[in-house]
From Swiss-Prot:
Protein name per Swiss-Prot or TrEMBL: Weak toxin 2
Places the protein is found: Secreted
Biological role stated in the UniProt entry: Binds with low affinity to muscular (alpha-1-beta-1-delta-epsilon/CHRNA1-CHRNB1-CHRND-CHRNE) and very low affinity to neuronal (alpha-7/CHRNA7) nicotinic acetylcholine receptor (nAChR).
A Gene Ontology molecular function term of the record: ion channel regulator activity
Entry's family note: Belongs to the three-finger toxin family. Ancestral subfamily. Orphan group II sub-subfamily.
Entry's transmembrane regions: none
Assigned GO CC terms: extracellular region
Superkingdom per UniProt: Eukaryota
Amino acid sequence: MKTLLLTLVVVAIVCLDLGYTLTCLICPEKDCQKVHTCRNEEKICVKRSYDKNQLGWRAQRGCAVSCPKAKPNETVQCCSTDKCNK
């Protein structure tokens, strides 16, 4: 009986997907504090920085499924821990 109960608990945990959900920063400011909870399939935080002509460097932050490739005049930083895309 105990074995059956233990098996049911394990199956319930696997089926419910009680996994970890990543949180990333999502604002363009340098001192960004706005946090976003990523979707289950998004396991990476991204910060894309690019030159905005005479306005200086700008950044985009958010969640991603995979780390994007950098475009010309752009840097991309990817990480996989909470709020790591500062």
